[in-house]
Amino acid sequence: MKRLLNCTTSEMLSMNKDELKQSILACEGRTVMTETVCAIPPLLGDLTNAELAVSFGSDMVLLNVFDCNHPTIMGLPETEQPVQLLKKLIGRPVGCNLEPIDNDATMMEDRYEISSGRHATKETFIKAKELGFDFICLTGNPGTGVSHASIEKAILLAKEYFGGLIIAGKMHSSGIDEALVDLKSIEGFIEAGADIILMPAVNTVPGLTEKELHTACQFIKSKGALSLSAIGTSQEGSDEATIREIALMNKRCGIDIQHIGDAGWCGMALPENIMTLSIAIRGKRRT
């Protein structure tokens, strides 16, 4: 199996979930994932944010606010198969966020209601598979009310009905006050079938230390899963020095995939920050 950073477009798009997972592992912490909002006009108008992200060094693209019941990616020409067309244009694995809402959880802020096509359910997992997504991310946007317990339940459903790579975890509170890096929850996610565990990047949420993330990464690796650090706190719009520091610190912790979020301009990180992240963890040759 070739490293993802050595693969051609055709090789990337022909991988099954196990091959993609192994290819990421073989990169030894040199994989960049960019999250983009696909439901608003993109930064460059007639070019999708995903295409722009890939041109600045992204290996994987995660679509946020994607509605499986009304599949639309702004910036694409009209098509009945937007995910397949996007994959053809960028030549990279593409996934989407689906949110396991916990209606019984105590919220620490007003709950933000989302459409049914964004919920993590049997129906959306089936549609995500039909649309051609390579992976799904079970997480929560701000204020939607996603808990560790609801994520674990959703993993079991996704394992049965989706079939691709499953990413699971929280970038931030999502409106619920609970530990964001919790080994018991991580173990539950992996046992339920998660392939990649998402955690906040060190320096993005208050109080999360390198030691905690390093311990979690070692635990995740021992269980045969991959780790992903997320910049999901609008710091994707910070200066390049901040991004570089986050990138190196989280690579030192043992992270396999470094994610950069969508809260820069027009539903994506500042393009320069995607490149800064990529260069920091693998140099210009691989960017």
Residue ranges of each PLM-predicted region?
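Surface-exposed amphipathic alpha-helices with a cationic face
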Residues: 16-28, 54, 82-94, 100-102, ...
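Active-site beta->alpha loop and helix N-cap motifs at the rims of alpha/beta catalytic domains
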Residues: 1-14, 36-152, 165-183, 190-191, ...
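A beta-strand-loop signature enriched in Asp, Gly, Thr, and Trp
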Residues: 200-216
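Short beta-alpha connecting loops at secondary-structure transitions
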Residues: 231, 261-263
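C-terminal helical cap(s) of enzyme catalytic domains, especially alpha/beta-barrels
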Residues: 73-84, 216, 263-287
